[in-house]
Every structure is written in C-alpha cells, then in structure tokens.
Amino acid sequence: MVLFIISSNAYALEPGKWSFVQEDEYCYIGSLATETDLPENKIRGDNYILVYRIIGSNQNIVQIEAGYNYNTEKNILVKIDNTDFDFYTVEDSPDSAWTDDDNKVIYAMKKGLSLIITGESSRGTITNDSYSLNGFTAAFNDLMNECK
C-alpha cells in the first residue's frame, strides 16, 4: 500500500469536479466533497477522494483522506448510490482509508451518481461527506489512457 497525501490547494481539486493529475511516477484523479456535515465547533484538514495509479502498474487504488484521524477500530462506510462498501484504516496513517475491493468500487463509481463517506474520528465524531460522481468516468478514462 502506497500512501498519497496531497494538498487540495496544490492541485486545485474542486468540489463536484473530478480532476486528472499526472506526475513523474504516478497519476491520480480526485475530487473534494460537495457537502460535509462536520459540526461547526470541529476542525479538520483537507478531505478528498482519489483513484491513483503508479506509472507502469495496472493497479488502480482508491484512497480516502478524512482530514482527521479515523477510529482505527471501525470501518469507514462508502455508499455509492444504493451499494455499500467497507473501507479500513491503519494505525500508521489513521487519516487515510482504503478498500480491498478497488475494482468493484471503481465500477460502482463509473455507474453511480453520488458517493457518501461515513466515518468516525478517533474522538467519536461522525462525519458524512458527499461527493458527486458526475465526470468521474471521463476522468477515469484519462487515468487509464494517460498513465501507462
């Protein structure tokens, strides 16, 4: 597992838009949440979702960044339209989450309209982040065609 941490400002990720970025060793597509229900008195860092690929690899990996440390004892729920997927986090990078079903998640993202991530912080705060999947398929096609 490779951990990618980017600044959403550095690569101009936008809410509701899927952006393609190519670097020397990897490429990714990403988006910011269109809506989040974090309580007003809580603070968090950048939160976004990526699909990345190492150049020369044929593996596409879905990664979520929460902007806070997840509760490592609980799964993160990703709901794409009416289908649920479990993501997990690890102690070495508690603000990130992955799945063992990347291809299934990507397939659902290509077919879906919306994605909602429900996670619990290490302090017990539950968040729901909503993402639009409009434009995901076009961005994913760029990833597949340009990142070889």
Spans of features found by a protein language model:
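N-terminal signal peptide c-region/cleavage motif recognized by signal peptidases
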Residues: 5-9
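A generic "folded-domain core" signal
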Residues: 11-148
